[in-house]
């Protein structure tokens, strides 16, 4: 065959899976965002080559300082934060009595957040409803099983 098409030349040069990509779209996007000259290769002798070598370690060190002190994986870090007990916020000396009163109202006087729907400060030491008088959930279940109560089929 005497004449070859452009696709034949492309196949001969790089094969069917050429590593060279058509960067026309990328060039257009670069021009659009104004980064056309940001990837220029410096000519020999015009710009020192050590500039890029010196900049890489400094950026690496800056990123190392921002990392966590411990080398925990993100999963371990997540579970440590989830399983640790929640701490009440540190109360600083308030400038006015009003802001201190608001903080006490929100967090309660002993540093524990009040339950939703509780008026004033709730006593968390009382625990479950009916703990002393025997009207809790388990007590009511056992009372259902007493003889003479319940449905006639169970008597």
UniProtKB/Swiss-Prot annotation:
It holds the Pfam family Myelin_MBP. InterPro entries: Myelin_BP. GO terms for molecular function: structural constituent of myelin sheath. The keyword Amino-acid biosynthesis does not apply. Residues 1-72, 113-155 are annotated as: Disordered. Residues 37-49, 123-134 have a biased composition (Basic and acidic residues). The keyword Cell membrane applies. Its main location: membrane. It is found in: Myelin membrane. It is a peripheral membrane protein. The modification N-acetylalanine is found at residue 2. PROSITE patterns: MYELIN_MBP. Keywords: Acetylation, Cell membrane, Membrane, Phosphoprotein. One of its GO terms (cellular component) is plasma membrane. This protein may function to maintain proper structure of myelin. Belongs to the myelin basic protein family. PANTHER family: MYELIN BASIC PROTEIN. This is Myelin basic protein. The lineage of its organism: Eukaryota, Metazoa, Chordata, Craniata, Vertebrata.
């Amino acid at each position: 065959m005497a004449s070859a098409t452009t696709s034949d030349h492309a196949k001969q040069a790089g094969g069917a899976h050429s590593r060279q990509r058509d960067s026309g779209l990328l060039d257009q996007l670069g021009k659009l965002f104004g980064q056309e000259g940001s990837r220029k290769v410096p000519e020999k002798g015009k710009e020192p080559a050590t500039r890029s070598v010196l900049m890489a370690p400094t950026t690496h060190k800056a990123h190392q300082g921002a990392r966590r002190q411990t080398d925990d994986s993100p999963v371990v870090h997540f579970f440590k934060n989830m399983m640790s007990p929640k701490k009440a916020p540190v109360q600083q000396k308030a400038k006015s009595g009003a802001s201190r009163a608001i903080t006490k109202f929100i967090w309660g006087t002993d540093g524990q957040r009040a339950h939703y729907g509780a008026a004033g400060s709730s006593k968390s030491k009382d625990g479950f409803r009916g703990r002393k008088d025997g009207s809790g959930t388990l007590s009511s279940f056992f009372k259902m099983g007493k003889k003479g109560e319940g449905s006639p089929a169970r008597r």
